[in-house]
Each structure stands twice: as C-alpha cells, then as structure tokens.
Amino acid sequence: MTVPARRALIPALVAATLLTGCGAKYDPQPSAQAAQAPSSSCVDTSGDSVKVGLLNSLSGTMAVSETTVNRSLNLAIEEINADGGVLGKELDPVTEDGASEPTVFAEKAAKLIRQDCVAAVFGGWTSASRKAMLPVFEAQDSLLFYPVQYEGLEASPNIFYTGATTNQQIVPALDHLREQGHRRIFLVGSDYVFPRTANRIINAYAAAHGMEVVGEEYVPMGSTEFSTIVNKLLASDADAVFNTLNGDSNVAFFRQYTSVGLEAGEMPVVSVSVAEEEVPGIGVENIAGQLTSWNYYQTVDTPENERFVRAFQDRYGGGRVTSDPMEAAYTSVHLWRAMVEKAGSFDVDAVREAADGTVVEAPEGTVEVDGETQHVTKTPRIGRIREDGLIETVEEAAEPVAPDPFLTGYDWADGVSG
C-alpha cells in the first residue's frame, strides 16, 4: 500500500446527472429549490450555545446503518460539552431524519441551515444523499461533514470528507486480493453512484494488473432477491467477489450466498459497506471468514479507541459494537471543534482557512485534514469477520495514507473520472 503524493485540487464534479439510490437519473430540481441564493448567515453565536445539525437516515433501508452513526455523533457532542464546549459554547444538536431518500436529505439540509441556523451539519451515508445535499451547502455556503467511505472523484469547498476515498479503501482491497492470488472477480452492488463509480475504477485497476472482471451486477437499493445473481456467481468461475451493496440488501445477499454452499475459503467476498453493526442482521454464520476493507475496526489497538468503545458502550449498552462510519462520524465532530478553535471563529471561511493540517488523535489513529481536497488521511485496514462478529485486522498500512480522491497518483486511473 503506497502513499501517492498530494496533487492540486481538481474542481468538484457536477452532481445533476448522476445516479440515485434507485438507479434512476438524479433529478436536481428539489435540491435546486432548496439551494436558493443565501442571505447572510443566521448562525447565532451571541449566546451560551451554538446549534449543529445531525442528518442521518433514522428510517428506511439505510436506518440499519445510519442510526448508530447518529448515536456516535451525539456521543461526541456530549463529550465536547463536558469538556467546555467549542469556544466556550455548548453544542445544541438538531436532529433530522433523511429517511433513506436523497431528496429528503436535500430538504432537511436546507431546513437545518436556513431555519435552524446550524453552524455545521454532520451526516449522510449514500453518495446519492451527499450529491443531493451538495448544491444546498454550496449555495448556502454552509459546511457538511460527510463521514462515510465513497467513490472519490469529488471535492467541494462546502464538504469535509472524513470517510475514506478510493485510494484509502477500494485500491487497498484490490491490492490485497491480487496479493492473495485472486484474478477473477465478480462485482455486485446497489444501483446508484457509489457502486457504479467504484466498479468503473475496479475495472480500470483489473485491466492494468492482470485481473479479469467476470461479472458485474446491480440491484435497486433495498433489494432482497439475489437468486439470479448467486446463480451467475456459481457459473462465472470467479475466485472472489467485490461487494458494494449498501443497507439491508447485504442481509439477503449473504444468506443466499451461503444457502447454495458458497463460503469464504472457496470464493471470498470483500465488502466495503459491511461493518460490525451489520453482522448480527446478516447472521455471523453467513459471513464469518469474509473480508472487509475499512480504516477502523472495534478491535483496533489504540488508547483513543479503548476510550471510544468504552464510552459508547457505557452510553448505549455494553453489547453495542462500534464501526468505521460511526468512528469517522465521531471523529468529524472533534475535527470540526479543532478547526473552529484553531480559527477562533465559527465563520465558514475562517474554519476552511484553518482546516489544512488540523490533526486529531482519533480511535483509528492519527487523522489530518488536507486543506486542498478537504479530505483526511486514513490508515487502510483489511479485516476478516470473526465468529464472535467482530472484525480482526489481517493487513494494515504502515502509516496513514494521504487522500487522492481523483486518483491522480495512479497511471492506470487515467480517464476514469471522465
């Protein structure tokens, strides 16, 4: 796993024609209405508290993953308030439900910014939700902290990306498969922008590294029927599966994968959207031994992670697990606090100006903001799901990897963003 050099910022991609979570063309109209030209910021910093927005899917197909992210955001806010707040002001969270619908995310983002007057918003999961919100935050000149791994090929002055970009998750997973001798991979994903873009990148990687994509299949978000895809898997002569399914579709996929006798030793599945929180719903008997690619697992051995896991379980119950998106969300609030206090102001321009080089010691390890791309350094980790449902690291980068969202450090990726 290598660390590409930082490159100059490439302008943000326009979201209007990209795919939504249901595979249809993204309709920019709801976001365009939400993203009306801003007046002056209504954020009120004159009192003893400042509002922040929490925007996650608390209902719908993504609630299985996003509800716990909301809990980790609240934990970070509680910790910060107990430690004196931000610039001496208590954080007052305003929670909204994105309902697993991109248009709802855009509408709720506009409400949080214009009506609730929040200083920043933390949330989103699917790339469809992020791309629906992007024009709102840009038009209103407000800040979104987006905590989930994504397909890259984007940078916005109004988004801080605290999850992994492609070179910090997808590429390390492909490197691992190749190093383990896998050459014939089958791609299965949800039908929206993240899986389709990730798979375009995977196809380019495979072509340059002597690997073959022997199948590529998509299902609508929330789909639970995988018999046709599993039969294609059986007939494909694949020796590994790269899984970009999101939400509760993973439950049905792994159960049907196991039901036909497939197993990790024969045809391993590497997943980039299955973490500790999803394992119980899938059933550990259906997924033990399978691989994941993230930057954080509950089993990561750092003092900060020991404190994080203990605090989360003390707050929400001893049997609760922690996961990469939860940790990245938790870290994003602490990063924002560090940026605001470095700037000495809640002002968006001042916070952006202070962002570059801001460092926090997070549960996953050292995280540093790259001010050019507004992404962060991450430590790639390949994990294997254990019989107890936790994930153990089987390969880890020697040091945090700088973000390269446009893959400019990889010759094989030329033209991928076009």
Task: Locate each region found by the language model.
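Bacterial lipoprotein signal-peptidase II cleavage site
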Residues: 22-32
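Extracellular/periplasmic Venus flytrap/periplasmic-binding protein
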Residues: 107, 151-152, 157-260, 299-307
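Signal peptide-proximal N-terminal region
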Residues: 45, 71-93, 207-210
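Beta-alpha junction/loop-to-helix N-cap segments that form part of ligand/metal-binding clefts
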Residues: 28, 37-38, 64-71, 84-153, ...
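Segments of small-molecule ligand-sensing domains
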Residues: 314-323, 337-395, 399
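Periplasmic-binding protein-like
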Residues: 112-125, 145-147, 186-189, 237-247, ...
